[in-house]
Structures are given as structure tokens and as C-alpha cells.
Regions:
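Conserved glycine-rich Rossmann-like NAD(P)H-binding loop of the short-chain dehydrogenase/reductase
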Residues: 26-42
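Canonical Rossmann dinucleotide-binding motif of NAD(H)/NADP(H)-dependent dehydrogenases/reductases
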Residues: 1-31
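Hydrophobic positions on the long internal alpha-helix
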Residues: 85, 121-125, 129, 173-174
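Structural signature of the Rossmann-like NAD(P)-dependent dehydrogenase/reductase core
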Residues: 7-8, 86-87, 136-142, 187-192
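The beta1-alpha1 cofactor-binding region of Rossmann-like NAD(H)/NADP(H)-dependent oxidoreductases
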Residues: 37-38, 58-70
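Catalytic loop of short-chain dehydrogenase/reductase
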Residues: 90-91, 95-111, 116, 130-182
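C-terminal helical subdomain
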Residues: 168, 183-186, 190-193, 198, ...
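A glycine-rich helix->loop->beta "capping" turn
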Residues: 50-53, 73-86, 92, 103
């Protein structure tokens, strides 16, 4: 029986490519979590046309009823979940906006998706993850969530306060999830995909194929893999 992976925000970009690589290179059954049925179905058909075992799962990470329905479907069809990739995320602030000028509403809306929704999905699917022999939880973060790199001047004047704060919070949640699994075969880690060129990031510098690699690596970690780490292509990043 193949392992089952759920990727949120999987109808395009890094999420879709993560699903593709897990199915194509590692034999996973992949569940494409997406809010829009048409976009999710189109993504599923794209992977199926490549001969991959892909299924659309209607999932709005910001909607509790949608999450509950998705959990029931996965439980009924598979009885467990081996991998959860919290890939869904948003960048809502303008690149040039100084932190004091970013509206509170932008922070709230950013946290709603990047933090609260990720926790809601993780919380709901946690029992199914624990039914796996070796679950892998991957939170797609970003190095802009590193307090150390912002403090030492690495990013200069680039201070996207909503995005950075939300990813720092996601990193902290990852550490807490990992602590729950400290004496188990399960693993929880945060991934930095790098500057990926997507519809949501027109300033990206690398392909989605490259950007998905860290998530795939963390989703397929062996028994001796890290737990509670912040990584990019096997390299640890500073918190």
C-alpha cells in the first residue's frame, strides 16, 4: 500500500509541484488540498495525465467545516495520513511598505492563513497522522521568518512585517509539534523553499521544481532525520 500525503494549497505552484514529486519520485498517493473545486480538479487531472495517483480534496484551511469534512473523507478512504504539508500561504503586503505603515488588517489576514489555518489543519489531521507508522509534518515557512537573519542585517530594509511575523510564528508552532513527537518515529519540521517564481511571488529567482525539493526531502525523511528543525535543502537555518 502506498503512503498517503496531503498538501494544502496544492492546485498550483510549490504545492502542486510538491505533490508531483512525491507521487512521481516516491510513489505516494497525493491528496491535493484546494479551496476552488475547478482549480483543484484541473490540478488533479494534470497529475493523472502524467500517470500519477492524485486526488482532489476540497479543503479551505480557513474554514472549520471544510476541514472537518476533509478529515472525514481521508479517514474513511485511507484510515491514516503519512504526510501533511502545510503549504497554503499568503503574502498580502507591498514590498515597499515600511512596517509602521502596514495596516493591522493585513497582519490579521496574513496570520489567518499562514498561522491559524495551518494549526487548524494540523490539529484536525493529527489523529490520522498518529495512525501512520512514521508521520511527517512539513510546514512551508520562509527564511524571512528568521529573527536572527533580520537582526544581523541579512535582509537590509526588506521587512515584510506581516509575512515575517507569521512565518516566525509558524516556526515556533513547528517546534512545539515536534516536541510532542520527541519520543516517537514521527517528525515535524519547517521548510524554506527559497525565492521561487510563482504567481504569488513575481520576484522569485528559482523554479517551482527547485522550490519544492525541501518539502519533498522533509516529507520523505528516514528514521534518523531531524525533528523540530528549520531547513533548506538539508541545511539548517537560524531561528
Amino acid at each position: 500500500m502506498s503512503k498517503v500525503a496531503l498538501i494544502t494549497g496544492a492546485n498550483k505552484g510549490i504545492g502542486l509541484e510538491t505533490a508531483r514529486q512525491l507521487a512521481r519520485d516516491h510513489g505516494f498517493t497525493v491528496l491535493l488540498g484546494a479551496r476552488d473545486p475547478k482549480h483543484g480538479t484541473d490540478a488533479m487531472n494534470q497529475l493523472r495525465n502524467e500517470g500519477l495517483d492524485a486526488h482532489f480534496l476540497h479543503l479551505d484551511p480557513t474554514n472549520s467545516a471544510s476541514i472537518e469534512a476533509a478529515v472525514l473523507l481521508v479517514s474513511a478512504d485511507y484510515g491514516h495520513l503519512d504526510v501533511l504539508v502545510n503549504n497554503a500561504g499568503v503574502l498580502l503586503e507591498a514590498d515597499s511598505a515600511p512596517p509602521p505603515q502596514v495596516p493591522v488588517s493585513v497582519l490579521r489576514d496574513t496570520f489567518e492563513v499562514n498561522v491559524f489555518a495551518a494549526h487548524a489543519v494540523t490539529q484536525a489531521f493529527w489523529p490520522l497522522l498518529e495512525q501512520s507508522s512514521a508521520a511527517r509534518l512539513v510546514n512551508v515557512s520562509s527564511w524571512v521568518g528568521s529573527l536572527s537573519l533580520h537582526s544581523d542585517g541579512t535582509f537590509g530594509d526588506y521587512k515584510p512585517i506581516a509575512l515575517s511575523s507569521s512565518k516566525a510564528a509558524l516556526n515556533m508552532m513547528t517546534v512545539h509539534y515536534a516536541w510532542q513527537w520527541r519520543d516517537s518515529p514521527h517528525r515535524a519540521n519547517a521548510a524554506h523553499p527559497d525565492k521561487v517564481l510563482t504567481s504569488g511571488n513575481p520576484h522569485g529567482e528559482i523554479s517551482v521544481e527547485e522550490g519544492a525539493k525541501t518539502s519533498v526531502e522533509l516529507a520523505t525523511l528516514g528514521a534518523d532525520g531531524p525533528n523540530g528543525a528549520f531547513l533548506h535543502l538539508g541545511q539548517r537555518l537560524p531561528w
